[in-house]
UniProtKB/Swiss-Prot annotation:
Locations listed in the record: Cytoplasm
Annotated EC: 1.2.1.103, 1.2.1.106
Protein name as it appears in the record: Putative [LysW]-L-2-aminoadipate/[LysW]-L-glutamate phosphate reductase
One Gene Ontology term, aspect cellular component: cytoplasm
SUPFAM superfamilies linked: Glyceraldehyde-3-phosphate dehydrogenase-like, C-terminal domain (SSF55347), NAD(P)-binding Rossmann-fold domains (SSF51735)
InterPro entries: AGPR_type-1, LysY, NAD(P)-bd_dom_sf, NAGSA_dehydrogenase, Semialdehyde_DH_NAD-bd
Native source species: Cenarchaeum symbiosum (strain A)
Entry keyword annotation includes Oxidoreductase: yes
UniProt entry tagged with the keyword Cytoplasm: yes
Pathway terms, separated by semicolons: Amino-acid biosynthesis; L-lysine biosynthesis via AAA pathway; L-lysine from L-alpha-aminoadipate (Thermus route): step 3/5; Amino-acid biosynthesis; L-arginine biosynthesis
Residues bound to NADP(+): 9-12, 315
SMART domains, per the entry: Semialdhyde_dh
General function of this protein: Involved in both the arginine and lysine biosynthetic pathways.
Amino acid sequence: MKVGVVGASGYVGGETLRLLVNHPDVEIAAVTSRQHVGEYLHRVQPSLRGFTDLTFSELDYDRLSDSCDLVFTAVPHGTATDIVRALYDRDIKVIDLSADYRLHDPADYTKWYGWEHPHPDYLSKSVFGIPELHREEIRSAKLVSCPGCMAVTSILALAPPVREGLVDTEHIVVDSKIGSSGAGAGAGTAHAMRAGVIRPYKPAKHRHTGEIEQELSGIAGKKIRVSMSPHAVDVVRGILCTNHVFLTREASEKDLWKMYRQAYGEERFVRLIRDKKGLYKFPDPKFLVGSNFCDIGFDLDEDNNRLVAISASDNLMKGAAGSAIQNMNIMAGLDEMSGLRYTPLTPV
C-alpha cells in the first residue's frame, strides 16, 4: 500500500512517519512540507535518520493522486479544509489529523474555533476515527478524521456508562492532564517556566469539549453537555483524564467491571486497569509512552453515587498518529495491529 503524508514537520507528522517507516505493509510514496522542500526527512525529524532517504516535496495533488492509495494530512487546524477536499475530490482516501473535519455540525466550528467552515457539505462525508466505536463505518470510509487526543481518551472511558443509560447527562466533568507535546512543535516558553508546572489552560472552553459532546450525544440519543478543564503538566508525552459522572441508578463495582469488559474485552488497544495492590492501581500515562494503548480504570464513590472513570494514553499515539495508523489498517483491510505492536517504553 502506498501512502503520502502532507505536513510532516511537526510532532504528529513525525510520529506518523515513525510508524509508517516500520509498517510491514506500507510504502511511503510522498511527504510534503511548505517550509522544507528538498530537505531530507531526517534533517527535520532526526529520529528517522537511517530509516529513509526520502526528501520533502511540494504539495502536488496530481502527484499524490498518481502515487498514493491513501494520504495522511497532518497540518495545523484551519489549513486542512481545502487540502482534504482536493484529495477527496481526486478519489484519494484521506486520514485527517487536524480538527477540520471532526465536528459534524458546521455551527460547532463557529462555536469552538471561531471560523465558518468553508466546506460544510463535506463534514457529513467524514467518519470520526475512533475504531472502538465506529469500526464498520471506518472500514468503508473515504475520509476519516482522527479525534483530538484528550477527546478520544475521555470518550473511551465515558462511552460505556453513557450507552448503558447510567449517567446523569447534565453533570459530566472531565479533568485532563496533558504533556507539553500536545501543544505542538513550535518554539514555546523557556524550560525554566515550563518545568514543574501544573497549569490550567482553557479551563472552561477547550475545543475538545465539542468532540466529547458530539460523540456522547450520539451514543445517548440526546444532547449531552460536558464540563472539561485541561491542565498542562511537566511531562512530554501523556494524557490522564479523570472523568466524573453521577449515576442515575445503583451499580456495583461488579456491574461496572462487567460493563467495561463487554465494551472492550475484545479490543486490542484498550486495557482495563484496576489492581488491588501495589503502586499501579489505576491508569498512568507514564506506562503508555510510545504505545497505542488507552488504559481505563474506575473507582466508585458510593456515598455520592459518583463513578470516577480514569483513562490514560500517549497523546501522540492513541491520541494522534497511532489512531491514524489503526484507522488506515481498518480502511485497507489489514491486521488492525499491523505496524502498532509496540510495548510502552519504561522507564522514561
